[in-house]
From Swiss-Prot:
Residues 83-96 have a biased composition (Low complexity). SUPFAM superfamilies: CCCH zinc finger. Residues 145-157 have a biased composition (Basic and acidic residues). This is Proline-rich protein 3. The keyword Zinc-finger applies. Signal peptide: none annotated. It comes from the Eukaryota. The lineage of its organism: Eukaryota, Metazoa, Chordata, Craniata, Vertebrata. Residues 35-46, 69-82 have a biased composition (Pro residues). A zinc finger (C3H1-type) spans 155-183. Keywords: Metal-binding, Zinc, Zinc-finger. It comes from Pan troglodytes. The gene is PRR3.
Length: 188
């Protein structure tokens, strides 16, 4: 008899839930949940505090929880959108200095130690030079030098330039898409 008293003293108080049948550790239960340490798998599936409920597959937490919970070991921290030390490529504000002329991230105006170097400097030179050459070739082809004899395109079939009609000159001169009477076609 004294042995029984010791066992009763160490047992936790009984709960009002019905006793559950002993589980075998095969993993072939009705709900198909694997057997493992409860700390890694989380609490057993329960819905409204009733084990074995058909809705229990939707809830992996205490009663009243909303949606499935991910165990802490498998969850990832949220991405640092504009916060923290990692700033490149994560969202709209990827550089503290904004975007440069060509849409790339601009570097600080005077890079300190560790910000410059031959790799980054040569990258920007390689990226900018072809664009400069392209833009120069476009300007050279569309705007011939003043010394060359200019061949005027006849634009008399186009509408008259409003600015030229009012002021007698146009700021776009030869590049204007409209008709300048007496300049790029016969006078009216």
């Amino acid at each position: 008899m004294p042995k029984r008293k010791k066992q009763n003293q160490h047992q936790p108080p009984t709960q009002q839930q019905p006793p559950l049948p002993e589980r075998e550790e095969t993993g072939d239960e009705e709900d198909g949940s694997p057997i493992g340490p409860p700390s890694l798998l989380g609490p057993p599936p329960m819905a409204n505090g009733k084990p074995g409920d058909p809705k229990s597959a939707l809830h992996r937490g205490p009663p009243g929880s909303r949606g499935p919970l991910i165990p802490p070991l498998l969850s990832l921290p949220p991405p640092p959108w504009g916060r923290g030390p990692i700033r490149r490529g994560l969202g709209p504000r990827s550089s503290p200095y904004g975007r440069g002329w060509w849409g790339v991230n601009a570097e600080p105006p005077f890079p300190g130690p560790g910000h410059g170097g031959p790799t980054r400097g040569s990258f920007h030179k390689e990226q900018r030079n072809p664009r400069r050459l392209k833009s120069w070739s476009l300007i050279k082809n569309t705007c011939p030098p003043k010394d060359d004899p200019q061949v005027m395109e006849d634009k008399s079939d186009r509408p008259v330039c409003r600015h030229f009609a009012k002021k007698g000159h146009c700021r776009y001169e030869d590049l204007c898409a409209f008709y300048h009477p007496g300049v790029n076609g016969p006078p009216l």
